[in-house]
Regions:
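Class I SAM-dependent methyltransferase SAM/SAH-binding core
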Residues: 40-107
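Conserved alpha-helix/loop element of class I SAM-dependent methyltransferases that forms part
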Residues: 2-44, 55-62
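C-terminal lobe and adjacent flexible extensions of AdoMet/dcAdoMet transferase-like proteins
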Residues: 189-240
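A short glycine-rich, Lys/Arg-flanked "PGG" loop and its adjoining helix->strand segment in the class I
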Residues: 131-146
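Short conserved loop adjoining the S-adenosyl-L-methionine
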Residues: 107-112, 128
Length: 240
C-alpha cells in the first residue's frame, strides 16, 4: 500500500507527515501509537522496532526540546537509514532530541525505570519471545509509566496453511497472538490499567487496496473467509 495513504488511514495527520524526513514513512504502520500516547513536553520515550524513524520523529515533536525519544532497532540497515534522517528532522523542526540504538526488543539497550512512555508500531507480534518483550517494557518504564502500542492480533487462530507461509510472517500475521492472549501477557508482566481496543478498519483497508502481500495471504484462507475475520489492528494501552 502507498505509505502516505496508509498513514492517513490509520490516523496520522497531514501536518505531522509533511514535517517528516523523506523516506521515514515506510508504510509499515498498523495504527498511531503516538496519538494514543498523548505525549507531553519533557517526557522520555522509547520506540520498539523504530525502522526509518517514523514514530520517533513524530514523538520528538510532541516531547519538545526538554524531552528525549530513543528508537531501538535490531537491523543495522534500518539504524543507518534512521540516523541519516536526523539531519533533516533537525532542519524541519529545530529540535535535537532523538537518537537510535542498535538492539533487540527482547533485550533493550535502555536502563531500568528510565522511560515515561514505550511506543511500538506493528513490531511486537514479530518477536519469537513476546513474554520477554513485555517484561523488558515493564523493566525500562518508570513507576506509572505508560505503554502505547499498535500491533496486529488474531481474533481466532490462523489456519496452518496461512501460518506456514513466509509471506504471512513478513506481513506481521503468522506470529501474531490472540487478543485475549495479549492481555494475559501484559498481566503476567505486571501491567495494570490494560485497555485493548480492536481497530478492524486497518485490515479492511489493506483488503480494499489489493496489497500484494495481503492478497497472497487472503487467497490461502478457507473459501468464504477474509483477512478481517482473523486479523485485527489492536491498540494496547497499559500502566506500570
Amino acid at each position: 500500500a502507498d505509505p502516505a495513504r496508509l498513514a492517513a488511514a490509520v490516523g496520522y495527520d497531514a501536518e505531522s507527515l509533511a514535517k517528516l524526513p523523506d523516506g521515514a514513512n515506510m508504510g509499515l504502520s498498523c495504527g498511531n501509537p503516538v496519538a494514543i500516547a498523548a505525549l507531553r513536553e519533557g517526557q522520555t520515550v522509547v520506540d520498539l522496532g523504530s525502522g526509518g524513524g517514523f514514530d520517533v520523529f513524530q514523538a520528538g515533536e510532541k516531547v519538545k526540546a526538554s524531552g528525549r525519544v530513543i528508537g531501538v532497532d535490531m537491523t543495522p540497515e534500518m539504524l543507518a537509514k534512521a540516523r541519516k534522517n536526523i539531519g533533516q528532522y533537525r532542519q524541519r523542526t529545530g529540535l535535537d532530541n532523538v537518537e537510535f540504538r542498535l538492539g533487540e526488543i527482547e533485550c533493550l539497550p535502555v536502563p531500568d525505570n528510565s522511560v515515561d512512555v514505550v511506543l511500538s508500531n506493528c513490531v511486537i507480534n514479530l518477536s519469537p519471545d513476546k513474554p520477554k518483550v513485555w517484561r523488558e517494557i515493564y523493566r525500562v518504564l518508570k513507576s506509572g509509566g505508560k505503554v502505547s502500542v499498535s500491533d496486529l492480533a488474531l481474533l481466532k487462530p490462523l489456519p496452518d496453511t496461512v501460518r506456514d507461509m513466509a509471506a504471512a510472517l513478513v506481513g506481521c500475521v503468522a506470529s501474531a497472538v490472540l487478543v485475549e492472549e495479549t492481555k494475559v501477557l501484559l498481566e503476567k508482566a505486571g501491567f495494570t490499567s490494560i485497555v485493548l481496543t480492536p481497530k478492524p478498519d486497518y485490515v479492511r483497508n489493506m483488503q480494499d487496496w489489493n496489497d500484494p502481500l495481503y492478497k497472497q495471504i487472503a487467497e490461502t484462507l478457507p473459501q468464504g473467509e477474509e483477512m478481517a475475520d482473523y486479523v485485527v489492528s489492536l491498540s494496547i494501552e497499559a500502566r506500570k
